[in-house]
Amino acid sequence: MEQPAGLQVDYMFRGVEHAVRVVVSGQVLELEVEDRMTADQWRGEFDANFIEDLTHKTGNFKQFSIFCNMLESALTQSSESVTLDLLTYTDLESLRSRKLGGRPGPCPRSAQLNSKRYLILIYSVEFDRIHYPLPLPYQGKPDPVVLQGIIRSLKEELGHLRGMNGGQDARETEIWHLREQVTRLASEKRELEAQLGRSREEALAGRAARQEAESLRGLVRGLELELRQERGLGGRAAGRRSQDCRRLAKELEEVKASERNLRARLKTLNCELAMYRRGRRTLPAGAREDRALSSRERSTSRGRTATRSSSRESNRGARSHGRPAHPSPSPTGSRVPRFDPTAFVKAKEKKQREIRMKRQQQQQQQRNRMGSGGSGDGPSVSWSHQTRPPAAVTGRGDAANRSRNRSSSVDSFRSRCSSVSSCSELEDFSQSVSKSRRCRGRGKPPSPIPWSGSKTKSTTRERNNHQRHLASSGAWVPIKEYSSDYQGADMAEIDARLKALQEYMNRLDTRS
């Protein structure tokens, strides 16, 4: 290939500007490097054999012409696969040691080696980099006389060329300007490439930011949807809670009304107990109406109370149907007076005297019936809750049996009073007492056994007087006469129950 006569290019080696001149004449390559700052020069001549032997040693053989073309491409920077570098001997040895993996050798002591420079042609392939070193001995600074001669010869040549053809001068000037423009455009190209790389990076970053923003928007939309759903659920839950609050408030009002009715019932029972204690048996018509009204209110309160058991409601209903029409004072009446022991003892003695009188009258009547040949058998009595002991029915048992029966009744009553812990249980107990009385009133006394005494017959007038006396005292007037022992046991049991009930009420007053 025909090579140019010469080529001079300014090249930057490690930040220092150098002038590189290449001249190829036949099979000889002349290479000169000059430092623009210090004017130091390094020059070398290489024939084709040296170049080919150098490329063979590196492991990548190149012919002389190809090597010259590679050097020209590196100087003009027309190919990215070939570049140039200027190294000292020390730099070259360190490069060789790194390539071979050994330690760098000691620095040379020769000044000639230190002053020598090596122009390195670097050929970069896909997976390898080959270095072709060209040694350039130091030539020193140029001689001023020689430089002046060169300058004069160049001026003469320049004048001759200008005189020969002015058009060629213009062409050369244009070429020089074009070269400068090419250099400037090459630098601008490099700057634009760098700017393009930065723009691509920014575009990639912006795309990632947009994707992240889209994902955040989707997350926000999902959270807003969940928030609306939670608000809907919260509104429904609040509505249910408000309904529960209204229902509980209504139940509370019903419970308060039931409590007021129970308190009124308790006061009514206290008043009834006080009236029973005083021995009042006959009641006016107005009191009966009040009692019926109170009974209706209590039945309404029991119907609204959900905590009552069905068995207790049925028992209370049965007792309310069979309860006698006793007076019920107003719940807002005065407080029941406290228990008076002296009055209670006097009333008890009075009742005992009445019992003895009734017993004597019954014995007299039995003697009269026995004397007249009557059988003396009365109608049988059916008891729904308890069975009378034979000693209390026949009248043949002695006083010890009667007292034992009375004491057992008192003990059972006291044990029941001790188990009563609320007003509702006290209400059931008072109703059970009234029920037992009604059962006795509705039932028939047991048939008395004839008494082995005198057979004196009582008159009809005495029997009528005895019935009127029982009616005035509030007791049940039997259709047929029954045993005096049975009456005594019944009255004693009633007294014992009233006494135990009074003690229980006293304990309640003491607690309050």
Curated annotation (Swiss-Prot):
Molecular functions (GO terms): identical protein binding; microtubule binding
Q: What is its main location?
A: cytoplasm
Please give the residue ranges the record annotates as the region Head domain: 1-142
Q: For this UniProt record, give its keywords in alphabetical order, as a comma-separated list.
A: Acetylation, Cell projection, Cilium biogenesis/degradation, Coiled coil, Cytoplasm, Cytoskeleton, Phosphoprotein
Taxonomy, superkingdom: Eukaryota
Q: Which InterPro entries match?
A: CCDC61_N
Instruction: Look up the coiled coil feature and give its residue ranges.
Output: 176-203, 246-273
Function, as annotated: Microtubule-binding centrosomal protein required for centriole cohesion, independently of the centrosome-associated protein/CEP250 and rootletin/CROCC linker. In interphase, required for anchoring microtubule at the mother centriole subdistal appendages and for centrosome positioning. During mitosis, may be involved in spindle assembly and chromatin alignment by regulating the organization of spindle microtubules into a symmetrical structure. Plays a non-essential role in ciliogenesis.
> Which proteins does it associate with, and in what oligomeric form?
Forms homodimers (via head domain). Interacts with CEP170. Interacts with PCM1 and CEP131. Binds tubulin.
What is this protein identified as?
Centrosomal protein CCDC61
